[in-house]
């Protein structure tokens, strides 16, 4: 037995590597001075340029499938959908001010809403359908951007919405949205292009106000940001002017599109100047924003949601 122990001990010694544990492969030689100088010249502006180019390349991946969605609605006499888009966007904007959400949350939620509505533009949309979709979009955006996520009850604006939805209904809506949007939630919006240090309140308010008008949906996010930055820059020496040429993509945006977007944003800016209350994050609800309640019993409403939006009858037995 002792011989076996000695043999085992000797084998262990054979496996022992008698060398300094701190010895390692010698470090590689330093790069040539030219490379060190090039690496040292990388500035925050260069990093911003790379981020800007990345956003410009990706922005159309998060655009609507129907480029001129507003024109499509008008041509097909879908004025109710066009009207409900503005109402839903106004709710998102108001929720941002009421709950203290980040502006990025409102822009992302509006992007989810517009993409989902354009994908399902063949549906006959009703007020309650747009309501539950908008709440689902806002809930997903909060989970992506917010540190403190509001409850599903708080996300519903009882003073403006005609319905109050159960948490299970909103969670089902979230799954439907994720599938329809192919889980692409980290989207590129006009807010993505705004510089953190030089962005003014006017720029942010202009872009938030543009969410209410579906006519702006046909323009690239970078072009919308460039138009808002131009109007909020008081002098040609303003730092925002340096961004404009980088935001406008000459190969994908014609001069006509650039001028049209700028003129529309300018008209919006003038309207906000004449009516300062409209640019507030706490808009007053006009009669057009008051949704008429959908008067049916809970089972019919629940089955209608299931049939129209979820494509399943499994929710039929429960009420909203």
Swiss-Prot record:
Coiled coil: none annotated. Residues 24-34 have a biased composition (Pro residues). InterPro entries: Cyclin, Cyclin-like_dom, Cyclin-like_sf, Cyclin_C-dom, Cyclin_N. GO terms for biological process: cell division; G1/S transition of mitotic cell cycle. It comes from the Eukaryota. Belongs to the cyclin family. Cyclin D subfamily. This is Putative cyclin-D7-1. It comes from Oryza sativa subsp. japonica (Rice). The lineage of its organism: Eukaryota, Viridiplantae, Streptophyta, Embryophyta, Tracheophyta.
């Amino acid at each position: 037995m002792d011989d076996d122990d000695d043999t085992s001990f000797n084998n262990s010694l054979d496996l022992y590597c008698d060398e300094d544990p701190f010895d390692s492969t010698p470090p590689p030689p330093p790069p040539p001075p030219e490379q060190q100088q090039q690496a040292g010249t990388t500035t925050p502006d260069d990093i911003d340029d790379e981020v800007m180019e990345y956003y410009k390349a990706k922005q159309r991946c998060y655009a609507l499938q129907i480029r001129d969605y507003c024109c499509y609605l008008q041509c097909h006499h879908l004025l109710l959908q066009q009207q409900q888009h503005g109402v839903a966007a106004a709710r998102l904007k108001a929720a941002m001010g009421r709950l203290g959400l980040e502006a990025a949350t409102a822009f992302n939620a509006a992007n989810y809403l517009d993409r989902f509505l354009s994908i399902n533009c063949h549906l006959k949309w009703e007020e309650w359908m747009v309501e539950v979709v908008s709440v689902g979009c806002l809930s997903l955006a909060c989970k992506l951007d917010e540190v403190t996520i509001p409850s599903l009850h708080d996300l519903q604006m009882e003073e403006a919405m005609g319905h109050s939805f159960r948490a299970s209904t909103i969670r089902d809506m979230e799954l439907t949205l994720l599938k329809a949007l192919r889980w692409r939630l980290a989207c590129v919006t006009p807010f993505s292009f705004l510089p953190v240090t030089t962005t003014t309140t006017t720029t942010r308010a202009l872009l938030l106000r543009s969410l209410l008008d579906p006519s702006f949906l046909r323009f690239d996010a970078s072009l919308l940001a460039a138009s808002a930055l131009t109007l909020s820059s008081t002098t040609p020496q303003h730092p925002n002017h340096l961004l404009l040429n980088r935001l406008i993509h000459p190969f994908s945006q014609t001069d006509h599109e650039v001028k049209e977007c700028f003129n529309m944003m300018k008209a919006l800016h003038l309207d906000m100047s004449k009516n300062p209350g409209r640019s507030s994050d706490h808009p007053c609800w006009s009669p057009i924003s008051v949704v008429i309640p959908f008067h049916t019993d809970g089972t019919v409403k629940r089955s209608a949601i299931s049939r129209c939006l979820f494509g399943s009858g499994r929710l039929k037995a429960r009420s909203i």
